[in-house]
C-alpha cells in the first residue's frame, strides 16, 4: 500500500505531517498565508486611528513558567570611567559632561508577551516540516526555524471574546474553548475567519496578570484541540491568547500536555503568541483590526518578545 506523505505513520504511531504544503524547505509556516493582498485588506480596516497596545510590561516579577527567569541589571560605572578620561569635563566625558547608563539582561524570550518560533515545540524528535532535532540543534540555537526566519506580521486581526460570550468575567483553568464558542462569538459580531487572519482569544484570564500572579501561573483556560484544528482548517496565520501558554491547562487529556500548541506549531506551522494583554480591547468591543507584530530577529532563537498593536 502506498501512503501519502501527510498520512504515513511515524515511529510513534502518529501520522506524518511533512513535507509542508508550503514546501519541503519552508520555515515560515502559516505566515505564508499573509499575502500582499492580505496586508492591503488589513490596512483598510483602520478608521479611527486608535492604537491598542497588547503587550505586558517586562520585569523580574512577572509570572512565568517554572525555571524561566528575567533579570535586568543596570550598569552605571561609565560615570566614573568617563571622569577619568583625558577629555573629561568636571562631571563626565567632554566639556559637555555627557554620561550614560545601560542595562544588561539575563532572560529567556519564552516569558512575557512573546511569539513562539516554529522550533519551540516538537513531536518526538521532529519539528514543523519534519526537521530532525539532531540535524538542526546547535550550541546557540537551531540552524532552521529560528525566530529570525519568521516574517514580521501585518494582517487582519480578530478578537474573539469568549469571556463575554459566556457571560462571565473570566473562564477557569481547564475550561475548553470549543468551535461552537468561537462560532457563537463571531456570529454576535458579524465577522468570519479568513485565510491569513490572526485570531486572538480573550478569556479574561489575563486580568490576573499583576493582580494575582500565583493564580495566573497555575492553570489556564484556552482553545481546545478541535478548535485548534478548526483554525488550521481555516488557514489562519497566527493565533494567541491572554494566557501563559495556549490551550487549556489542565489539558483535555491528562496524558497529552500542551497538545494544542503542539498541533498548531508542529503539524500546521501556525504561529502562537502568548501572554497577550487583551482587557482594554475587549472592554471597548474591538473585534476586527489591523494587527502589527514586529519581533526582534534573534538568530536561531525559539521565540521573541513582542509588543503587538491592534489599530482600528
Description of each model-found segment:
Residues 1-312:
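Active-/binding-site microenvironments in catalytic and ligand-binding cores
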Amino acid at each position: 500500500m502506498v501512503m501519502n506523505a501527510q498520512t504515513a505513520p511515524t515511529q510513534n504511531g502518529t501520522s506524518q505531517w511533512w513535507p509542508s504544503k508550503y514546501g519541503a524547505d519552508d520555515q515560515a509556516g502559516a505566515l505564508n498565508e499573509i499575502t500582499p493582498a492580505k496586508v492591503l485588506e488589513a490596512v483598510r480596516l483602520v478608521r479611527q486611528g486608535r492604537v491598542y497596545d497588547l503587550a505586558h510590561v517586562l520585569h523580574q516579577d512577572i509570572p512565568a513558567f517554572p525555571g524561566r527567569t528575567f533579570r535586568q541589571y543596570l550598569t552605571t560605572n561609565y560615570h566614573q570611567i568617563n571622569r577619568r578620561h583625558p577629555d573629561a569635563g568636571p562631571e563626565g566625558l567632554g566639556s559637555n559632561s555627557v554620561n550614560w547608563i545601560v542595562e544588561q539582561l539575563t532572560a529567556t524570550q519564552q516569558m512575557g508577551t512573546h511569539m513562539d518560533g516554529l522550533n519551540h515545540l516538537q513531536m518526538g524528535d521532529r519539528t514543523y516540516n519534519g526537521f530532525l532535532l539532531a540535524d538542526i540543534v546547535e550550541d546557540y540555537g537551531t540552524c532552521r526555524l529560528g525566530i529570525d526566519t519568521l516574517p514580521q506580521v501585518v494582517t487582519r486581526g480578530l478578537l474573539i471574546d469568549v469571556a463575554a460570550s459566556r457571560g462571565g468575567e473570566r473562564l477557569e483553568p481547564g475550561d475548553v474553548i470549543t468551535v461552537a464558542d468561537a462560532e457563537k462569538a463571531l456570529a454576535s459580531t458579524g465577522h468570519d475567519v479568513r485565510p491569513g487572519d490572526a485570531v486572538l482569544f480573550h478569556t479574561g484570564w489575563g486580568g490576573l496578570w499583576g493582580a494575582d500572579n500565583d493564580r495566573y501561573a497555575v492553570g489556564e483556560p484556552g482553545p481546545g484541540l478541535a478548535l485548534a484544528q478548526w483554525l488550521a482548517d481555516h488557514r489562519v496565520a497566527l493565533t494567541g491568547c491572554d494566557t501563559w501558554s495556549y490551550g487549556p491547562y489542565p489539558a483535555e487529556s491528562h496524558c497529552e500536555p500542551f497538545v494544542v500548541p503542539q498541533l498548531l506549531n508542529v503539524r500546521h506551522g501556525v504561529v502562537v503568541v502568548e501572554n497577550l494583554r487583551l482587557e482594554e480591547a475587549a472592554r471597548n468591543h474591538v473585534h476586527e483590526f489591523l494587527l502589527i507584530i514586529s519581533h526582534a530577529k534573534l538568530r536561531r532563537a525559539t521565540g521573541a518578545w513582542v509588543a503587538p498593536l491592534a489599530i482600528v
